[in-house]
């Protein structure tokens, strides 16, 4: 309405647009924009309409529910313009919805030194602003929004995410009160724990903080013993998979976590044209709700799906394999058995013949692509003769399902 005062979100967006315009040589004035845009880091950003057909539509991630639990797909580490990224919070919601995610945690840095727009005097906001904006948009887009933030310090102890908190302002101030990295982290995590937070050690293998080796320091033992480490990021899009973090998670009972840690629009970091998928944390929850996600994180019912690999505990990966690996149309003949296999997910399946099937012949190595349907044939050792077995097992090592470091899960089909 004419003369109506802009609300807080509109005012902040206008401040940021004005800032970007001043630093972009007038390019923004040539681009017609709405409220939810993709921002390029130095000032050029496009609305969905402006991108048009030049950008590929992201592939929606499809993964079936498992027995007794809903399979929720989400992002637990991502940034916006309210710390040091170039993306508006509502754009993160648009991305999540388009890619088929169920939840995201916007984890902007809570450290005062990393609130770049505020420090330059360009925008005025508190450290909960990105969550407030995202939570409002999430309701209309059916995306669950977890209130989170990232405490970023030198190594040790490094960076930690605080998830399911209520006030990032007090967490940031508690950390900012100390110059020593460990004392600052401990103070921030103590405040987050007081708020009921779920605490995650981020990217322990990030080369800027782990130049030559990935180490578990005495400071991490102290935080772990104090109940200030509940999960660990075993995959981060900046630095990939960490076998060390995976091993620590299994040894110490930490929840397996994944994050893109993205500071730019997703279409700049994920090649959707090639069909790539952003790394996600899979949460096996009793219900699709924030409470359901939190209960599953506490119970360690998670897996990481990244770069074609799935990392998780066997108690969730085995039912996941059962849910997505559909077998039907079994036909018995004297010399062979044929059956149809359908991959009901966005996860490729890399299969290798495993011990226990030495008396039958079937492909030793194969890949079943997402949603692909294949016919498999099993013969006896001499395909010109009857199989000669009353019953047998077709055993696979699922090479891209790791239930521990370098430990593929085995999966069997029984025929009789």
Question: Where are the predicted features?
Answer:
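Bacterial N-terminal signal peptides
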Residues: 41-49
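Short, Lys/Arg-enriched N-terminal segments with co-localized hydrophobic residues
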Residues: 28-32
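Aromatic-lined carbohydrate-recognition surfaces of secreted/lumenal glycan-active proteins
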Residues: 200-212
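Charged catalytic cores and adjacent phosphate/nucleic-acid-binding surfaces used
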Residues: 7-8, 54-75, 93, 157-166, ...
């Amino acid at each position: 309405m004419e003369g109506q005062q802009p609300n807080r979100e509109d005012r902040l967006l206008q401040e940021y647009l004005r800032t970007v315009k001043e630093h972009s040589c007038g390019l923004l004035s040539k681009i017609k924009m709405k409220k939810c845009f993709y921002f390029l880091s130095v000032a050029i950003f496009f609305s969905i309409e402006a991108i048009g057909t030049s950008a590929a539509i992201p592939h929606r991630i499809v993964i079936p529910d498992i027995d007794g639990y809903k399979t929720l797909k989400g992002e637990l580490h991502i940034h916006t313009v309210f710390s040091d990224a170039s993306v508006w919070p509502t754009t993160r919601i648009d991305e999540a919805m388009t890619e088929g995610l169920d939840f995201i945690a916007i984890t902007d840095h809570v450290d005062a030194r990393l609130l770049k727009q505020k420090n330059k005097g360009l925008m005025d906001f508190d450290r909960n602003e990105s969550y407030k904006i995202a939570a409002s948009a999430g309701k209309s887009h059916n995306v669950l929004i977890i209130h989170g933030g990232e405490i970023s310090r030198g190594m040790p102890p490094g960076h930690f995410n605080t998830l399911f908190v209520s006030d990032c302002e007090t967490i940031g101030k508690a950390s900012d009160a100390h110059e020593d990295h460990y004392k600052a982290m401990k103070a921030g995590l103590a405040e987050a724990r007081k708020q009921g937070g779920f605490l995650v050690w981020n990217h322990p293998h990030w080369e800027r903080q782990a130049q030559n080796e990935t180490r578990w320091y005495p400071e991490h033992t102290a935080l772990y013993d104090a109940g200030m480490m509940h999960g660990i990021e075993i995959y981060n899009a900046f630095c990939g998979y960490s076998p060390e973090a995976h091993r620590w998670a299994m040894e110490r009972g930490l929840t397996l976590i994944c994050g893109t840690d993205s500071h730019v629009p997703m279409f700049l970091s994920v090649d959707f044209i090639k069909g790539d998928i952003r790394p996600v944390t899979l949460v096996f929850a009793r219900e699709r709700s924030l409470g359901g996600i939190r209960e599953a994180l506490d119970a360690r019912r998670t897996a990481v799906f990244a770069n074609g690999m799935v990392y998780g505990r066997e108690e969730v990966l085995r039912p996941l394999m059962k849910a997505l690996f559909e077998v039907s149309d079994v036909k018995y003949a004297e010399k062979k058995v044929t059956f149809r296999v359908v991959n009901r997910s966005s996860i490729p399946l890399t299969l290798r013949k495993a011990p226990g099937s030495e008396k039958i012949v079937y492909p030793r190595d194969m890949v079943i692509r997402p949603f692909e349907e294949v016919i498999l044939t099993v013969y006896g050792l001499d395909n010109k003769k009857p199989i000669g077995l009353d019953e047998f097992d077709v055993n696979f090592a699922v090479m891209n399902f790791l239930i521990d470091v370098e430990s593929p899960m085995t999966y069997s089909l029984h025929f009789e």
